[in-house]
Amino acid sequence: MIEVGEYKIKEGLYYTKEHEWVQVLEDGTVLVGITDYAQKELGDLAYVELPEVGKVVEKGDVLCEVESVKAVSEVYAPVSGEVIEVNEELADSPEKINEDPYEAWIAKIKPKNLEEELKELMDAKAYAEYLKTL
């Protein structure tokens, strides 16, 4: 784990400038969630609008929304592909993202252009450097 101030960054994941993370699984699918920075900035989450299974997204499309006491924030698809599973636990317990943002994934995506799109994402060290500029 890398720490930048109060924010934790899990190594081995890929990151976006919009504060989503991507974990590549052995079967080639990816888990997507929001970072520690994102959940701390949002505050206590009250609701996660999960995407529909079967939804096809392009990188940068709105994947879903998360709602906190402070704001409603869009979560963007960090990779293109099809949503093949969602974390149903978040429907009843959105606070799981606040408790452990790197375990509380939002969606599993079957990517269609992973190798190319990963090149455009940051690794943990690059994301840590990016956070220092905010």
UniProtKB/Swiss-Prot annotation:
Binds 1 lipoyl cofactor covalently. GO terms for cellular component: cytoplasm; glycine cleavage complex. Gene3D superfamilies: 2.40.50.100. The modification N6-lipoyllysine is found at K70. Keywords: Lipoyl. Pfam families: GCV_H. Its cofactor is (R)-lipoate. GO terms for biological process: glycine decarboxylation via glycine cleavage system. The keyword Isomerase does not apply. Residues 29-110 form the Lipoyl-binding domain. InterPro entries: 2-oxoA_DH_lipoyl-BS, Biotin_lipoyl, GCV_H, GCV_H/Fam206, GCV_H_sub, Single_hybrid_motif. The glycine cleavage system is composed of four proteins: P, T, L and H. Belongs to the GcvH family. NCBIfam families: gcvH, PRK01202.1. The glycine cleavage system catalyzes the degradation of glycine. The H protein shuttles the methylamine group of glycine from the P protein to the T protein. This is Probable glycine cleavage system H protein. It comes from Pyrococcus furiosus (strain ATCC 43587 / DSM 3638 / JCM 8422 / Vc1). The gene is gcvH.
